[in-house]
Regions:
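Short, flexible N-terminal segments of the mature chain
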Residues: 13-41
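Acidic, low-complexity intrinsically disordered segments
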Residues: 34-87
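Hydrophobic side chains in beta-strands
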Residues: 7, 19-21, 83
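Amphipathic beta-strand/beta-sheet edge segments enriched in Tyr/Trp
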Residues: 3-5
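Solvent-exposed strand-loop boundary residues in beta-sheet-rich modules
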Residues: 9-11
Length: 87
């Protein structure tokens, strides 16, 4: 599974990271692990999954995390994650 993480500020892409998870774990575990790796790469705390994020991810394999999803203050408008390749 390959997931693309992007940080957006004022409609501009300010940072990007692609994480690839190749083990035989479940899809959910792969998504959570990729999110954790991306947050480490961006030096961020992990966002909180709200119901809207879960529903959007189920429908479109894509989710946006805004300031409402983070405990600490963030310096960007939102982080977007998108599944590029499934196993």
């Amino acid at each position: 599974m390959k997931i693309w993480f992007k940080l957006w500020t004022d409609t501009r892409l300010t940072a990007s990271e692609t994480i690839e998870i190749t083990d035989d774990d479940t899809r959910t575990h792969k998504v959570f692990r990729a999110l954790e790796e991306a947050c480490l790469a961006f030096d961020l705390g992990k966002p909180i999954w709200l119901d809207a994020n879960v529903n959007e991810f189920k429908r479109r394999s894509k989710a946006r995390f805004t300031k409402d999803n983070f405990v600490e203050e963030i310096e960007f408008d939102y982080m977007e994650m998108q599944v590029l390749e499934e196993d």
